[in-house]
Each structure stands twice: as C-alpha cells, then as structure tokens.
Amino acid sequence: MQLRQQSQQQLQHFHTVRLILGDQLNAQHTWYQQVDPKVLYLIAELHQENTYVTHHVQKICAFFSAMAQFASELGAAGHQVRYLTLDDTQGFTDLNALLECFVAETGAIKFEYQRPDEYRLLAQLSQLKLANAVVNCVDTEHFLFPFDEIDREFPQGRHRLMEHFYRRMRKRFNILMTDGKPVGGQWNFDANNRQKLKSQDIKSLPTPLMFGHNVEDILERLQRHGINTMGKADTRLLWPINRIQSLELLQYFCEYCLPAFGRFQDAMTQQHPAQWSLYHSRLSFSLNAKLISSLEVINAVIEHYHANPFIEIAQVEGFVRQILGWREYVRGIYWANMPNYANINALEAKRKLPDYFWHGKTRMNCLHHALSQSLDFAYAHHIQRLMVIGNFCLLTEIAPDEVDKWYLGVYVDAIEWVEMPNTRGMALFADGGIVGTKPYAASGSYINKMSDYCGSCHYKIKERSGALACPLNSLYWRFMDKHRAQLSHNPRIAMLYRTWDKTDETARQAILATAEQHLAQLERL
C-alpha cells in the first residue's frame, strides 16, 4: 500500500518522523523549541479514529479543524509538516499500516510519538514495528501529575478518595495556599455551590462566546467517505480550534462566568437561550486537545480572582477543583485500572440505550433537554451528564458498554481517559466503588431542586407510583431495593433504607410495580 500519488510526490528524505495525534496539539511541547529541517511532523485524519464509535459530527469537525490549524501554525513557525486528510489515508486500515508506509517513503531512520492518552492507541503504537527506523515514545508534557507516579498513587482496583488527592495537588503546586494552609480557611466550598437559578439569575445569564469556523469542506469530506456521525451538523463550528481562540474563551470565562460559576455549577434551566452553557467555561475541548494547559487556565482564574475582590473564593475553588483535582484524578484512575476497567460491570446492567438517545424525543422533560442539548451542541455541562443522563442510565440498568460508546461519541471533549471513569465509574457505579464511595443515584426530587424542568413535564414530580409518576422516583427506589445487600452497609445510604422500611408495604409494592412498568416501556417514556 502506498500513499495517494499527490501525497507521495511531496515527500522528501527526512531523518526523523514525529507523529502528532488529534488530542496532542500542545504548541508548548519541547519538540517545537528547535526548528530542524530533517524532522517531519505528521498529523493525519484517520478512518480508524472516526469509526471505532459513532462520533458527533461537530466533534469530528472540531478535531479536524484544530489539527489542520495546528499543522498550519507549525509550518508557519518553520517546521516541516505533512497533514493528511481522509482522502490521503483512505487506503489504510489502521494507524500502524499508515505509519509503516509513511516512514518508509520518507527514508527516516527514527520515529517518535507522544504517549497517547487512550489505552487503545498506546497498545496499538506499542506494537509498531518499522523495518529501518528506531521507535521512541515521549511524554505529552501536558498533565500535572506525572505518569510514572500513577501506579503508586492509584492502586489497581481500589478506591482512592479524590478529596485527599486534590489536597495533595494543591500543596504540591502551591495553588490557593497561604503558609501551607488553604486560602479561605477550608479546602472545599462545595456546600456553597448548590444553588438553583432564580428568575432574576436567569435573566442575567451571559451570552456564550461562540466561534464560527467554516467546516463545509470537512462535512463534505465526511460524507464522501461514508463516515457515520450523530448529532446536529452546522457549517459554522462554535468551538475554539486554536490556542488564540482558546485563550480568548478563557478570558471570557474569567470576566463573565467565574463570578457566579461555583454558586450555580449544579444548576439547570430551560428558560434561557444560554441554558446549555450557563456559567460553565466550555474549555474542556481546548484542554483535552491540549491547545491550552491546566496550569495556565488555573493561573488565569486565580489572577482574575486577585484582581477582582468581589469574586468569592468559593467560585474559584470550585473551578480549580475540577481542573487540578477531578481531571487529574480520573486520568490516574483510568491508567491504573486499564484495560480491565473497560470490562467492569459490577451491577450487571444489561439493557440497551433507548432510541431517544439519538433524537432526544422523550416525555421526560429533564432527559429531553439534556439529550437534545447534547445532540445540538456536542456538549452538556457536568450535572446534566451525571445527574440527568447518567442517573437515568444507572436507574434503568443500561449496559456500561452502551453508555460508554454514547458518551464517548456525543461530546466534543470526550476522550476515553476522561470519559470512562466519569461514565462507568462516577455515573454508573459499574466499577463497584473505585471512583465513588456510593452510586450517584437520585430521584426526581433532586432534579426538581436544581432545575425548572419538572413544572412543565408530562410526569408528576411528587408522585411515586402510577402511570404519570415521575419515572425517576419509582426507578430510584427499585434500584435501592434491588441492590440493598451491596449498598446498605454504606453509612451514607443507611438512612435511606430506614426511610424505605418505614414506607407502607402497599405503597412500596406500588412503587416497585410502577418501576417495572416504566422499564417495560422504556422506549416510550
């Protein structure tokens, strides 16, 4: 197999070929400190990366656009770069086949790649054998917690409390610390950050900063190659596709969203055009593609906090915890437990995803909004992902493999290292407690507490049994009843079982029967 003739003719002889994957767009990597005309950088649109799950069309457009921009910027800086589109790579079944051909045609005697953040790709590249070139792997130089410390910090198969890890990271990098103690006198302000949006709050929601990169050529290319996608296609991409735009979005977050971020980070609404973005940074794609780094995001937020005394520490700490704590933590969980983590199904959930996960048409108003938003924007904020969609999948016993594939495909920021621990671990409790100490199961009352979805829903939020009862209510109690033997020893849950036991037997049976009816007609909820 050879590269397309047009691509082949442009190749010269190089000493070294360096591969850049689509989520390795880190312009600050030491690779780029020196310009060497004998080093050729390869960035490629790969069929294998667009077919292992069905991706949201905006996700593919975002990655392809960012990859092309990065290639252009490297070239402008004097580096030798080859960008291969799907047209160029269509003859290759997988990445290794492409690399064997490409490296051979350049005459390179050295091939280098940055360690992939997905186990699947690391395993694949570890098997790469090149006839005339030495293969070398280097670090991505992106994450704060060193890769070679993961096994020591995260024992395989065991729970490691995120809060303890987060505090050590705060100390290690001296973030929000004063004389060895946390700024504000406490480590965690989560209790301050659970407010519902009131009508006056909704009116003042900021209009999200969106970009408008033309992706018509990418959409046409995807169609020409028969790439199956999901979600709403838009010729104008709203996501940042380069470092400058990512920093612009960071600055926008600091100015317009940070002052209220923590307070409303768990809130949801259906009453504003910005209901999909609220006060969230939407920097996750930029971070996960490595267009910007965790530390510069954290430093920008803290600098803005110091320059604006009206911003409360609770708003800042809540954001820092997501980046410095949770993001680094789930990466550790992922690498410490793969590849077995991908097969864990502690609760033996086996149902398939309902069809409305691909069109959003369900009478459950909370789920309708969370799904529709995901399909429209390739994005949902974390509470929608965890407590609406994830909670629904947990209570209805959707197979973890099904949920993993959907989450990995639908969200623009989804890469397996961050998606799987959040989904299989946090949302589904399929890992049996490696990530969370208890399932994040909730009845409809939680949704009602944090949103305005329930008032206009087809189902009745205050009812637990009957055809019109909120499905989450009966499904919640069915879940707790079914898994009692496994969960009742947890002191955080024991009180719930005392409440259940005090419920009249007739009422309990009606609730459980309603749950079974909902499960029987899952496609029609």
Give, region by region, the residue ranges found by the protein language model.
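Beta-rich, aromatic/charged-enriched effector core domains that present basic-aromatic interfaces
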Residues: 92-239
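A short acidic (Asp/Glu
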Residues: 28-32, 53-55, 93-96, 121-126, ...
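A generic structural motif
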Residues: 44, 134-146, 417-425
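Short His-Asn-centered micro-motif
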Residues: 19-23, 44-45, 84-86, 113-116, ...
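N-terminal beta-strand-loop-alpha-helix module at the start
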Residues: 2-86
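C-terminal catalytic domain of photolyase/cryptochrome flavoproteins
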Residues: 9-11, 21, 274, 280-525
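Substrate/cofactor-recognition hotspot
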Residues: 15-27, 31, 57, 184-312, ...
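Long alpha-helical, hydrophobic tracts
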Residues: 28, 55-56, 64-68, 73-92, ...
